[in-house]
UniProtKB/Swiss-Prot annotation:
Domain of life: Archaea
Entry GO CC: cytoplasm
NCBIfam families referenced in this protein's UniProt entry, alphabetically: Shik_kin_archae
PANTHER family named in the record: HOMOSERINE/4-DIPHOSPHOCYTIDYL-2-C-METHYL-D-ERYTHRITOL KINASE, SHIKIMATE KINASE
Organism name: Methanococcoides burtonii (strain DSM 6242 / NBRC 107633 / OCM 468 / ACE-M)
Protein name: Shikimate kinase
Catalytic activity reported: shikimate + ATP = 3-phosphoshikimate + ADP + H(+)
Family stated for the protein in its record: Belongs to the GHMP kinase family. Archaeal shikimate kinase subfamily.
EC code: 2.7.1.71
Annotated gene: aroK
Amino acid sequence: MTFTGQAYALGAGTVINAIATWKGAAFGVDLKTFADVELTKESSSFIGTIEGVPHGDTTLIERSMDLVLEHFGIEMGGTVVTRSEVPLASGLKSSSAAANATILATLDALGETLEPLDAVKMGVRAAKDAGVTITGAFDDACASFFGGIVVTDNRTNELVKRTEKEMDVVIFAPDRQSFSSQTNVHNSELLAPWVDMAYDLALDGEYEKAMTLNGFLYCGALGFSTDVMMEALKCGVKGVSLSGTGPAYSALVDRKMADTLTKVWENLGTSGKVINTKINNDGLTKL
């Protein structure tokens, strides 16, 4: 007998990267990662597949399934297939989205529920176990799960603040990948006093100022060009940042500015794609 479940979770953009201080902020975007889970008592193994990435590392989604079953004391195996509108390894929280979607889909298959924050923390644990994150990415996981803009303390897994904001999001995703686990942590930690300033801005609701300061700081520490950000500022954009540990950049804008920035970023002369989306304030759900 098999049990099936489906769910999705959101990608996200960065306001404050938590690597320097373990305090972060992020916003959920209207790009989704979907998970389809099938469980069976005939097996005890977990097999994950990332659609379109035949040799992708599936440790995270397999561990996410395993933790849900372990929590409820259920001995089963199964498969999980994820498909995503979120570019992988680009700083747009594809790992958090995959973990959240898999956990919800597994709960759906079992007919079980968890408190939302418990589900988020389970995904954070799966990400740590799989070695795809440095801080656990609780900020990214909360943005992916709850939507809106979240401010967190990743050391204590505390959701400090959540705000809903109606804004468009423009993303520039270069044609290369950058994995969070390979980030230069030492360089990032040197930024701590200035990242704290950005975090204080986020606590005060000055999200655009916070993310722009964050972007210049982390571009410097991680070796990314600030040209993409400067072109956005020249257009009048107030909030633009390297997203996560890159290589993507994201900007918070109004509708009119979104059209202007899209044209500018499409003509950067850098190989990549421009994605138009918006902040998703609804959070995630089962399908």
